[in-house]
């Protein structure tokens, strides 16, 4: 698949990568229909976020179609059009239960395009799908 990845400060590239796969029962694989580039992505490319590793696919927002779901994804099905949140959340930890999703204690928060591969690609793996995706309105056009 095609993906736009960070290389090093001042450098990013469009490249070919392997399509992501389900690695946790709460994951979903989304075929990206629309994605965004925002100031945060530009800060990453500039080198302002040193924790972003070389070859990380950028992007943390998008709209897509679910192609595959893990066994413990209950709120979505294959074929659903979804909005991908910029914040991933487990929905179960202390902070998630209080609605403070950015502080998820179980590997959530701002991770897409930051700590894991993001949405500026043909496909993305979204962790904690039940809490990190939203059903798109049925009248939303591609």
Protein language model annotation of sequence segments:
Residues 20-35, 48-94, 137-139:
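Glycine-rich beta-strand-centered segment in the early N-terminal region that forms part
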Residues 11-19:
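Short glycine/threonine/proline-enriched tight-turn/helix- or strand-capping micro-motif at secondary-structure
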Residues 1-2:
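Extreme N-terminal starter segment of soluble prokaryotic enzymes
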Residues 40-46:
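Cytochrome P450 core scaffold surrounding the K-helix E-X-X-R motif
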Residues 8-10, 24:
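Residue-level recognition of beta-strand termini and adjacent short loop/turns
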Residues 92-142:
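NAD(P)H dinucleotide-binding glycine-rich loop of Rossmann-like/cofactor-binding domains
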Residues 5-7, 46, 66, 97:
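Residue-level signal for short segments within beta-strands and strand-turn junctions
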Residues 7, 19-20, 53-59, 111-117, ...:
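Short Gly/Pro-enriched turn/cap motifs at secondary-structure boundaries
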């Amino acid at each position: 698949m095609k993906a736009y990845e960070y290389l090093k400060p001042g450098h990013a590239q469009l490249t070919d990568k392997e399509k992501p796969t389900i690695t946790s029962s709460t994951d979903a694989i989304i075929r990206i229909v629309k994605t965004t580039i925002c100031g945060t992505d530009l800060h990453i490319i500039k080198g302002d976020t040193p924790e972003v590793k070389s070859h990380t696919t950028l992007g943390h927002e998008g709209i897509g179609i679910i192609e595959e779901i893990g066994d413990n994804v209950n709120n979505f099905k294959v074929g659903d059009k979804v909005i991908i949140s910029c914040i991933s959340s487990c929905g179960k930890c202390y902070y998630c239960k209080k609605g403070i999703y950015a502080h998820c204690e179980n590997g959530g928060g701002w991770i897409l395009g930051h700590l894991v591969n993001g949405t500026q690609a043909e496909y993305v793996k979204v962790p904690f799908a039940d809490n990190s995706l939203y059903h798109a309105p049925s009248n939303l056009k591609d």
